[in-house]
Structure formats: structure tokens, C-alpha cells
Amino acid sequence: MAKEIKTIGVLTSGGDAPGMNAAIRAVVRTAIARGLKVKGIKKGYQGLLNEEIIDMEAKDVSDIIQRGGTILGTARCLEFKEAEGQKKGAEICKKHGIDGIVVIGGDGSYRGAQALSRLGINTIGLPGTIDLDIACTEYTIGFDTAVNTAMQAIDKVKDTSSSHERCSIIEVMGRNAGYIALRCGIANGAEDILLPEKYDYNEQNIINNIITNRKHGKTHHIIINAEGIGHSTSMARRIEAATGIETRATILGYMQRGGSPTAKDRYYASIMGAYAVDIMLEGKTNRVVGYQHGEFIDFDIEEALQMEKGINEYQFEVSHLLSI
């Protein structure tokens, strides 16, 4: 018999992502519309352990859909990685009458949700990460905004790079996943794209490419470098020394996490938030919401965590075809 759900909690965990507020809003309003009470848990799992728990009404999420970041705050919590911390979190949920929690975050957040589910708290995970590195879904909350934010900056760097006939290395986020770099590189027309999934790149090939392109009349060269490759500043020095072409590195950093979410991030986050509440009311737990082939779906958390997501080889090939 499915556990009766009367009160749900919602938290954001790990790195913030534009669109998290849209998801929070959807969870709160859908739950209230379905006759549930809602508790907001501040600062992720750390806030749960600290009992930073507030009642939430529909008015509390007014005018947040367009805001970046997360109104609940977020934090990383080492204590919650341990069994004692997880047990404490489940006990606090029961103390506050929380029957289920919607967790918005990445893989690490899912593991925390999985632990709570094993301890009797219904949990549903939503993919909140700008990196698009969750294998069970083609979309993650914040990715589209991060790409658009990075693109605006890259376009500006490209303008000045062209004016000064420079080589420019622009480093974007993606410690273990190169999806932002690949998407931006293709959309910007970059000459080279460096991805963590292709870590065996040859720097001499890049240098040769720059020299060849200059001989063919290209007056500037754009390299999009994922954070997982890194070392953009030292790479710029080596390229300039080898080619004699002025080379500059620009590291975009945390600006990619901020800003008002795009229409796509607002829309998808809203649908996912509502979907999470509804599948919880169906009695589902230990699930994560994803988007595949035009549909919103859900997976067992363990199944989702075991999936592997590689870079799209055809898209990577196209990036080379278009860079000549």
C-alpha cells in the first residue's frame, strides 16, 4: 500500500543553476493545488540537518520564476554523505511531518535522496545542473541559460579577437563534462573545442591548425576550452610562443551559473516540478525525473546513477567539419 503523502519538502542542493526557482515555484504551487502542505528546506541537506525548515505558501513563490539562483539557498554537506547524517536527516523529516522531499540538484544530490528513500522518506529528484552531465536525461535545469550566458561573453571576446587578429582561448564550465563547451563551440564557430571526454587532445595539432588557418587567410582563432581541461592561461603562453600570434585566455567562471533563466529553462523546470509532485502522489519514490525524446519520464535513482553519458560523437565531428 502506497504511503499517504500529506506534507512534502523541497530543497536545492549542490551548485546553483538558473531555473531552480521555477522548479521550486512549480513544486510549491502544484502541491498546494493538490491539497498538500509544503515545507521549504534552506541550504540543501545542510539546512535539513540544521532544521532550517519553513512553511511555504503560494505567495512565497510569487515573482521568482524569472530570478536566477535559488531562493532556498544551497550548500554542499559532507555530513550527509555519512550514514549517521542521513539517519539524522530522515528523523528530522519525520519530526517535521515531512512525508516526501523533492530534491533539485545533480548526481550527488540524487545519492542523498536515495539514502532518505531507504530510510522511509519518499524522494523525487529533479536534474538541476548547468553541466548537462546526468545520463538519464537530455535536459537539465540551467544548461540552456548557461550556454546562452557563455555565448554572449564568447561573442564579445570574438569581436575583440577579430579586431586585434589574436588567438583567444575561452574557458567555460564543465569539470567532467564538455557539453557547454561543445554547444558553445558549434554555435560560435570556434576553430577548436577542448573537452574532458577527449582529454588526449594534442596541443601541437592546435598550434598547427592555427598556423594553417592563418596561411589560409583566417585572421583570428577561437578555442573553447572546458574547465576539465583547464590551464588556459599557460596554454595561451605556449601557443603564443610557438606561433608568434598574440594569444589571450578568458575564464568565464561563475557568471555561467547566474542570471535570469531562459524561457526554455523556466518552461522545462516548471513542468518537471509539477511532474515530481504528481508521481510522488502516485506512490513513487526513489525516482528521478528526466526528459527524453520529447517526453518527461522518470527512472529509479540507482538505475539513473549507473547510466553513462558520453559526448555526442557526431556533434563533435561536425564541430571539426565547420571549423575549416
For each of these PLM feature ranges, what is it?
Residues 2, 48-101, 108, 141-148, ...:
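Glycine-rich oxoanion-binding loops at beta->alpha junctions
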Residues 39, 117-140, 194-198, 251:
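Short, acidic/small-residue loops that bind anionic groups at enzyme active sites
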Residues 2-49:
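N-terminal phosphate-binding or glycine-rich loops at protein starts, especially the Walker A/P-loop
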Residues 136-147, 260-266:
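Short beta-strand elements at the ligand-binding edges of bilobed clamshell
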Residues 17-27, 49, 83-84, 100-114, ...:
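Short glycine/serine/threonine-rich phosphate/pyrophosphate-binding segments
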